A protein has these predicted regions:
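Helicase-associated low-complexity/disordered flanking segments
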Residues: 1-40, 44-48, 256-284
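Conserved P-loop/Walker A NTP-binding site and adjacent catalytic elements of P-loop NTPases
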Residues: 21-23, 29-205, 212, 230-235, ...
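Conserved C-terminal RecA-like helicase domain
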Residues: 79, 87, 94-103, 238-313, ...
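Conserved two-lobed SF2 helicase motor
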Residues: 114-129, 285-296, 306-325
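Conserved interdomain hinge at the start of the Helicase C-terminal
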Residues: 212-236, 243, 300-308
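Non-catalytic terminal extensions of ATP-dependent helicases
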Residues: 288, 307-308, 393-394, 398-798
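Conserved segment of the helicase C-terminal RecA-like domain
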Residues: 330-333, 337-339, 345-386
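Compact beta-sheet-dominated globular domain cores
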Residues: 802-840
């Protein structure tokens, strides 16, 4: 029986409240006073702003709101900041209200979009609000994690629905809202409904606070001994979190029995990367690591172990994600300051409470603990004073350590102020974009009046409003000049005085706004060119968001190599530094793509909100014939391998979906298959997540996660595996061409081909030739022969060298071990010979 079966025959507020309360009681749930108050306001039609601590049951209030909307025959929207949380809520609401009554919109997928209960991201709702405004069929909006309103890049999406949906009842929820008086007044003015602020500082699990001056290892040891674990240690960089995990390996965290349970739960889980191998050691010791740069499967494993109560300590960052279910008894702050991208500053009250509020597990703990470490130099000074004892002479002789230069200090007073402080008032992040104007112009009615309302009746101060008005005028003029908008002499049947000359829905995609530009740019490429497949990749890569960490690593590598070359050429220091400023990361087809974008944006102005950005990540990895591990190692990205994987997965999805089948050459199809298999073998959860979002009726989120941990054999995808083999062989050709025999020795030492063996073999080649080709022809299928011998569990492979004379007499022979390849998720091969082909 679903919650929808409990709907009363009429929408009387008392009947609604009684029906929902009875259902909750049947589930063994006793409503907290704040929940009761919020639900009473919801059923009477009031807007509600709910600010209660983490773990106080805001989700139950949201369910009650949806229940009320359904009883009143209204469409109700639930929004969350991330797609994973939207997906999770979708399945939760399906269980409550039945799959036929719940839909989902994420930008990537649309499921049952006509359902009366819709789960979506804030951006999706904002897009609907801009396009349809007061005409949208939306009777209620439940906005979870409303503090995202103040996010610099995304906050606009939390404001637009409030401005544009006066017909809706709003329920705004967060644990860290601060002063919301202006929102109360604003919502009442716009919607004509009373607005109730429901606030409670009472936590289901009370918190106690402590400021300590002991070394952090001593602090952690004491927390473990006093049964205050699991402890979440807050760091302000991912590197610090990993370093802390390593430093804690000297503390005995778990009993033998607990370690056995950890090993049992880990089972056959594959730690496929360099960081994964370190993580395996940490978690088996009872130490977790959790941050956004990790592979999703590693984060999920840490969460699984934590939920089973097997981890004593989790080393993470201050950005413990929304919707991440990591049970914590104690939160330990290593500092009360952070670098925010511009400067080091004291934590804001909202930041502090957002993470401190994670302490204490409802249903498990009777108390939660929040501990803050003093600065290291203060701790060392306290230690020295303690050693001196009570002797005044000894204490005077203690040389106090000074804070590092530029250090932003904190103290117990800082800690006390943060504890007492309410979260800061939410700051408006309104912004004007091309798509905003286009969406409003596409609506029925007077677009000028609608835009004036948006620009002058938002939450911005007047000075900012004037800036937005100037930008809107500039965008409108560009739309007129580009012929995208035309004025009408008389209003049309729907009251428009201006109209679009293009079909916005066909040309604009919320999740891939530059996909139509990519489609137009494919026509600029020559299908007969040897670089066609890679050029197609470069077009698609230019439309993807920039992964800053990867691009910075590529730039650092390019500059490092350039410095070495300039030193060898005797270039003076000042000139070297001047030249270095011009060196950046690789940008294939930059001139072509920037010109094409300039032309395209004149007739498709909405793309101007998303500048094209040439880059080479997929192309770079493919041209270097690198595996995932080799790529992250080469660019020193092991600590942010999750970001690398997310980019690769996004690129695979874009390549697969954006490029029409008739434009996919054999080489390009091979490359796409290779990329998809590479992502799946490293961590299939991102691709599985997309598939599950598109087909939620096939499996639940939990089933999709379980599937992600059960990796398919890499040899099962024969086409992709051939490319992996080809890349593995060609990687050796490239290294041989660069005379990197030491790297070759590291690759093949186990099969008898150490650096000396490779050097000796290649000496013969260099005696005959002065170059070894590594261009498109050199890696083509004509120079690679594969003899499949599944009966013996292997493939025999021969890679021919592209010598400058075209003799094709030299090459590499190897055997590919199929079973080992499946075990490791990559092409595992053993070099058998390097030399003239007659000798192989």
């Amino acid at each position: 029986m679903t919650l929808i079966d409990q709907l009363p025959p009429n929408a009387d507020p008392d009947a609604l409240f009684e029906a929902f309360s009875s259902w909750a009681e049947d589930q063994g749930i006793t409503l907290y006073p704040a929940q009761e108050e919020a639900l009473m306001e919801v059923v009477t039609g009031a807007n509600v702003i709910l600010s209660t601590p983490t773990g106080s049951g805001k989700s139950l209030v949201a369910a009650g709101a949806h229940f009320t909307a359904l009883a009143q025959d209204k469409v109700t929207f639930y929004t969350a900041p991330i797609k994973a949380l939207v997906s999770e809520k979708f399945f939760d609401l399906c269980k409550l209200f039945g799959t036929e009554n719940v839909g989902m919109l994420t930008g990537d997928a649309s499921v049952n979009s006509d359902a009366p209960v819709i789960c979506c991201t804030a951006e999706v709702l904002a897009s609907i609000a801009l396009r349809d405004g007061k005409y949208a069929d939306i009777g209620q909006v439940v906005m979870d994690e409303f503090h995202f309103y103040a996010e610099p890049d995304r906050g606009w999406a939390w404001q637009i629905p409030i401005l544009e949906l006066p017909q809706a009842q709003f329920i705004l929820m967060s644990a860290t809202l601060g002063d919301m008086k202006r929102f109360e007044e604003d919502l009442t003015r716009r919607t004509g409904r009373p607005t109730s602020m429901v606030r409670s500082a009472t936590r289901p699990v009370p918190l106690s606070y402590e400021y300590v001056t002991t070394p952090i290892t001593d602090t952690i040891t004491e927390l473990l001994e006093t049964r205050q674990a699991p402890v979440y240690i807050v760091h302000f960089t991912q590197a610090q979190a990993v370093e802390r995990a390593q430093s804690l390996m000297s503390i005995n965290m778990c009993t033998r029995e607990e370690k056995d349970k950890i090993a049992e739960l880990i089972g056959n889980f594959r730690f496929t990367t360099k960081f994964g191998q370190n993580l395996s050691r940490y978690v088996r010791h009872g130490i977790g690591v959790h941050h956004a740069g990790m592979l999703p499967k590693y984060r999920r494993l840490v969460e699984k172990l934590a939920q089973a109560g097997l981890l004593k300590v989790i080393c993470g960052t201050d950005t413990l994600g929304v919707g991440v279910n990591v049970p914590i008894r104690t939160v330990l702050f290593t500092a009360l300051t952070k670098y925010d991208g511009t400067r080091v500053r004291t934590l804001r009250a909202r930041e502090f409470h957002q993470i401190a509020g994670r302490a204490g597990r409802a249903g498990f703990d009777t108390a939660g603990y929040v501990v803050a470490q003093a600065p290291e130099h203060v701790i060392e000074n306290e230690k020295a004073l303690a050693k001196a004892g009570d002797d005044p002479k000894k204490r005077r002789k203690v040389v106090r350590k000074k804070a590092p230069e530029g250090f932003v200090a904190w103290s117990d007073t800082t800690f006390e102020k943060l504890i007492a402080a309410d979260p800061e008032a939410l700051t408006s992040r309104f912004k004007v974009t091309n798509i905003m104007l286009l969406s409003v112009i596409a609506r029925p009615g007077d677009a000028f009046k609608a835009m004036r309302h948006l620009l002058e009746d938002n939450h911005e101060p007047r000075k900012a409003q004037l800036r937005h008005i100037r930008r809107a005028i500039a965008i409108y003029r560009s739309l007129l000049d580009g012929g995208v908008v035309e004025k009408l002499d008389t209003p049309d049947a729907e009251g428009r005085t201006i109209r679009l000359t293009v079909d916005l829905q066909q040309d604009f995609a919320l999740n891939q706004p530059l996909s139509t530009f990519a489609l137009a740019s494919f026509d600029l490429l020559d299908p007969e060119s040897p670089s066609y497949a890679l050029d197609m990749v470069s077009v698609v890569e230019s439309t993807l968001d920039d992964p800053r960490q990867i691009l910075a690593a590529q730039q650092n590598k390019e500059r490092g190599m350039a410095v070495g070359a300039m030193k060898a050429d005797g270039v003076e220091y000042e000139e070297r530094m001047e030249r270095l400023q011009e060196i950046t990361y690789p940008k294939p087809l930059e001139e072509l793509l920037l010109h094409a974008y300039d032309v395209y944006s004149k007739s498709h102005p909405w793309v101007r909100d998303h500048p094209v950005s040439p880059k080479s990540i997929i192309r770079d990895m493919y041209e270097r014939a690198m595996t995932f591990t080799e790529f992250t190692s080469y660019y020193e990205l092991a600590r942010t391998e999750g970001i690398v994987l997310r980019y690769l997965a996004s690129a695979f999805k874009a390549l697969d979906h954006t490029i029409p089948d008739d434009l996919k050459s054999e080489d390009l199809q091979d490359l796409i298959e290779w990329l998809g298999e590479l992502v799946r073998q490293v961590d299939s959860s991102l691709l599985d997540e997309w598939e599950q979002l598109a087909n939620p009726e096939v499996e639940t989120a939990e089933q999709a996660q379980e599937k992600a941990d059960q990796v398919k054999p890499v040899t099962a995808n024969a086409r992709a595996f051939r490319v992996l083999v080809r890349n593995a062989m060609f990687r050796r050709v490239e290294l041989a061409a660069l005379d990197h025999v030491n790297v070759l020795g590291e690759l093949d030492g186990d099969s008898g081909w150490d650096a000396d063996a490779w050097g000796e073999a290649m000496d013969g080649y260099w005696d005959e030739y002065d170059d070894l080709g590594t261009g498109p022809d050199a890696r083509g299928p004509k120079l690679l022969q594969i003899e499949e011998d599944p009966a013996h569990g292997l493939w025999r492979v021969r890679q021919t060298f592209a010598d400058p004379s075209g003799d094709h007499g030299w090459g590499i022979s190897a055997e590919v071990d199929l079973a080992a390849s499946d075990e490791e998720g990559r092409a595992v091969l053993r070099v058998t010979s390097v030399g003239e082909l007659g000798q192989l």
